[in-house]
Amino acid sequence: MAAPGRLLLRPRPGGLLLLLPGLLLPLADAFNLDVESPAEYAGPEGSYFGFAVDFFEPSTSSRMFLLVGAPKANTTQPGIVEGGQVLKCECSSSRRCQPIEFDSTGNRDYAKDDPLEFKSHQWFGASVRSKQDKILACAPLYHWRTEMKQEREPVGTCFLQDGTKTVEYAPCRSKNIDADGQGFCQGGFSIDFTKADRVLLGGPGSFYWQGQLISDQVAEIISKYDPNVYSIKYNNQLATRTAQAIFDDSYLGYSVAVGDFNGDGIEDFVSGVPRAARTLGMVYIYDGKNMSSLHNFTGEQMAAYFGFSVAATDINGDDYADVFIGAPLFMDRGSDGKLQEVGQVSVSLQRAVGDFQTTKLNGFEVFARFGSAIAPLGDLDQDGFNDIAIAAPYGGEDKKGLVYIFNGRSTGLNSVPSQILEGQWAAQSMPPSFGYSMKGATDVDRNGYPDLVVGAFGVDRAVLYRARPVVTVNAGLEVYPSILNQDNKICPLPGTALKVSCFNVRFCLKADGKGTLPRKLHFQVELLLDKLKQKGAIRRALFLHNRSPVHSKTMTVFRGGQMQCEELVAYLRDESEFRDKLTPITIFMEYRLDQRTAADATGLQPILNQFTPANVSRQAHILLDCGEDNVCKPKLEVSVNSDQKKIYIGDDNPLTLTVKAQNQGEGAYEAELIVSIPPQADFIGVVRNNEALARLSCAFKTENQTRQVVCDLGNPMKAGTQLLAGLRFSVHQQSEMDTSVKFDLKIQSSNSFDNVSPVVSYKVDLAVLAAVEIRGVSSPDHIFLPIPNWEYKENPETEEDVGPIVQHIYELRNNGPSSFSKAILNLQWPYKYNNNTLLYILHYDIDGPMNCTADTEINPLRIKTPEKNDTAAAGQGERNHLITKRDLTLREGDVHTLGCGIAKCLQITCQVGRLDRGKSAILYVKSLLWTETFMNKENQNHSYSLKSSASFNIIEFPYKNLPIEDLFNSTLVTTNITWGIQPAPMPVPVWVIILAVLAGLLLLAVLVFVMYRMGFFKRVRPPQEEQEREQLQPHENGEGNSET
């Protein structure tokens, strides 16, 4: 597996393969790095300008430069394609970049057309480092061959420039070639300088890619250089050697750093070995004196590329170098439990020589390659602790790249970035890779703060971020007196004759900072009274001069000078204007640098130290009647009762709770009675028609999805207060599973201590009450025999062949308030007597949630029913059988009752479904009086009472958890059959009609006369002319009456 974002050559069957699988990565930002006007540098298109970056400060010049590697740039070397360059860029407004000439020659030959080296595509500039006048730049893909062999081998080469002298440095170009030696060394893949003027070079391809570290003295490299000698031996060289075969493919030298880890004052060598330990990855620390092993770190996840990047710096100020190790392919589980690539940096703090404590810092985005580059920044904000930058070159919007700035502190690295730098370029043929290379810890503009350069080789850019000077402010705020007496009104309120209770607010600023800060610093200061009150709430204190809770001021202080102070007077509003007397009044002071503050000598605007608060606050308290400590401790109690102990389900149930609230302790401020309302109830209001009950002010509100009634009990609710109040509720939304309704009551105040009473619950039981009735009617209720013109037919076919229509109607009605879910209705119908049919059922109909069945076939003779409504039919039948011929007076004893005890009855059984309050189920039974039976001689001249009966039984209620009593009843419906003459209506005498007409006319005449005397029929029109108006005047005054 090749590195994520680095070049590395490995042999494969059939030839060599160049692997560049991760030239794509992301960017970050620190709080005092200037992101408003960074210096942007552009290189030749497609040259990978920005692949490596560093600062350069030659002793022969007062100017600072940037060094930027462009490993795919074309050069003037004859016959060379993409030989690569290192450019020197001016840190001035011109931002001009010029290539540094290290090598102007083409390939050298053993003989004509027999080259010994191959400089095309050598990636010169893939690594660049400087130290004072010295610059080391390398081409890790430089190839050469020996005279005896034709294979090209990527040994790598470097050039070292010291002032005007430039020498080639190729420690892997030796006779020990091929894969088992240094033939695939790729020397210069990673490089660094030590303080003792040694060069450290990594060659991850040596010894079957075990890798190798090589260190030589700069002086010896320069002194021994001979352009005619291709393989130079150095006497003071330190180098790792080949190891056992199990260390093959480890990539020692993939990344390097230096630092003193054994306390001898000589910098030691740190190297990442990302494929060691079966791809877990390792980091080795070697002694800088003899290349012996000092310490090893091992990764915890396979293929995470632990050791891809390394850095060494003292992050916590204990004078021990700490180690930072990047693993950009590290995977962690997301919130969904799935593994995702986030990258990781291990921070190993050295607490004593060789004693490390490691913590992990995971990346913030998926596939961002967090940890691809790590750059020590020096003390970026001048707080006494070094800081560090970590790149995620493929993070951010559209993978433009991110660089995170983390600040050091005494406990180690702050895990939250103080600033995030974002790449500004969209991907073109490849991602911008902003942050793939970084270098810091150098003060380019000499303002006392180190700066940072970031490379984005995917868009051929490098960006210089300069650090802004940091201002540290010491702010003071005093409030006196801190206990405010509302009754001590001694300050005149401007513009009025009123006096108010007042207090003083004194605020001060002092500022200082390191570096080239301007002498005068301007601040925008804002003071806010009663800060903790929410927006829109009444602020209890105002400034006297502007009657506002806000005061804004521009203050000027001298850097490093004395504390600058000012004083204002504020006052309390009248106590009738606010309720909260208990909460402290917070006086809040906030400050920020004024934009008019001059820039420093380098043109950068100062910035406030973000690690010190930019505000300060103090508190004042309103004097309370709570003893010497001014702390009120109430003793709140609540009790509740009601005269209603039971509520019927379905009823509108008005419920009155009588609540007793009392305070047996010190004053309770903003005291409120809070009643939590159950979902079955609604608040109606406060009982106001009872003199014994307090008329509280109550409001309904919802808090955290709990419905509440909140009643004001006083501010304060003084010691010894007892209140009795009535609250009315309606309870009407009970569910079928409820057995009771519960109200929770408590008293709450804004006091700091004992501010809530014990919660009291009041429970009212639910009960079932269903007033169900059954009633019936016969239509008609009386039939007179004989039927005129009726003739017997042996096989009747129509209703007229049988007899008149008789309809019995039964209604089962639930008058509530509770519902029932199932009932049985039984109808007993007098069908036959002595084998003679009485009432022949044609059919029955239902209205409502009911299904019925009969135990005998209905209408077995298939009597035809005309298509007209039953009511009309019944009425018509009634007209058809009126008898007017004779009148027969019947004795009471001559009536024969034919009910189910005597007659044979047909039974209709109905299952009734749910009936809520006010709902009914109706059964219509349409029948015919079997006239033949009553026209028999033995049945004539008798009266009959035909009775049907209906009964019901409630068998189920919808209320599962409540006890239910059995509910049943019955009723009878009677149709009377009379043999005789229907009583004719008595005619009205003619004299009665005449007398009524005359009385009406007389009454009308009296009304007309009375209205005439009152002037009802007079109509005075408005005058059209002035004369008419004058003529009308006498009449209006009553001086004449023409009509009279």
UniProtKB/Swiss-Prot annotation:
Record key words, sorted: Angiogenesis, Calcium, Cell adhesion, Cell junction, Cell membrane, Cleavage on pair of basic residues, Developmental protein, Differentiation, Disulfide bond, Glycoprotein, Integrin, Membrane, Metal-binding, Receptor, Repeat, Signal, Transmembrane, Transmembrane helix
Cellular component GO terms held in the UniProt record: alphav-beta3 integrin-HMGB1 complex; alphav-beta3 integrin-IGF-1-IGF1R complex; cell surface; cytosol; external side of plasma membrane; filopodium membrane; focal adhesion; integrin alphav-beta1 complex
Gene3D superfamilies xrefs: Bicelle-embedded integrin alpha(iib) transmembrane segment, Integrin alpha, N-terminal, Integrin domains. Chain A, domain 2, ntegrin, alpha v. Chain A, domain 3, ntegrin, alpha v. Chain A, domain 4
FG-GAP repeat coordinates: 32-98, 109-170, 173-225, 237-291, 292-357, 358-415, 419-482
Disruption phenotype: Mice expressing a null mutation of the alpha-V subunit gene survive until late in embryonic development and occasionally even to birth. They demonstrate cleft palate, and defective development of CNS and gastrointestinal blood vessels.
Motif (GFFKR motif): 1015-1019
Subcellular location: Cell membrane; Cell junction, Focal adhesion
Record Pfam families: FG-GAP (PF01839), Integrin_A_Ig_1 (PF08441), Integrin_A_Ig_2 (PF20805), Integrin_A_Ig_3 (PF20806), Integrin_alpha (PF00357)
Region of interest called Disordered, as start-end residue ranges on this chain: 1023-1044
UniProt: Ca(2+) 2 binding residues: D314, N316, D318, Y320, D322
Stored InterPro entries: FG-GAP, Int_alpha_beta-p, Integrin_alpha, Integrin_alpha_C_CS, Integrin_alpha_Ig-like_1, Integrin_alpha_Ig-like_2, Integrin_alpha_Ig-like_3, Integrin_alpha_N
Bilayer-crossing regions: 989-1012
Compositional bias segments (type: Basic and acidic residues): 1023-1038
Positions of glycan attachment: N74, N290, N296, N615, N704, N835, N851, N869, N941, N969, N976
Ligand binding (Ca(2+) 3): D379, D381, D383, F385, D387
Coiled coil among keywords: no
GO BP annotations listed: angiogenesis; apolipoprotein A-I-mediated signaling pathway; apoptotic cell clearance; blood vessel development; cell adhesion; cell adhesion mediated by integrin; cell-matrix adhesion; detection of molecule of bacterial origin
SMART domains: Int_alpha
Superkingdom in the source lineage: Eukaryota
Binding residues annotated for Ca(2+) 4, in chain numbering: D443, D445, N447, Y449, D451
One Gene Ontology MF term: extracellular matrix binding
Complex formation: Heterodimer of an alpha and a beta subunit. The alpha subunit is composed of a heavy and a light chain linked by a disulfide bond. Alpha-V (ITGAV) associates with either beta-1 (ITGB1), beta-3 (ITGB3), beta-5 (ITGB5), beta-6 (ITGB6) or beta-8 (ITGB8). Interacts with RAB25. Interacts with CIB1. Integrins ITGAV:ITGB3 and ITGAV:ITGB5 interact with FBLN5 (via N-terminus). ITGAV:ITGB3 and ITGAV:ITGB5 interact with CCN3. ITGAV:ITGB3 interacts with ADGRA2. ITGAV:ITGB3 interacts with FGF2; it is likely that FGF2 can simultaneously bind ITGAV:ITGB3 and FGF receptors.
Family: Belongs to the integrin alpha chain family.
Designated name of the protein: Integrin alpha-V
Natural source organism: Mus musculus
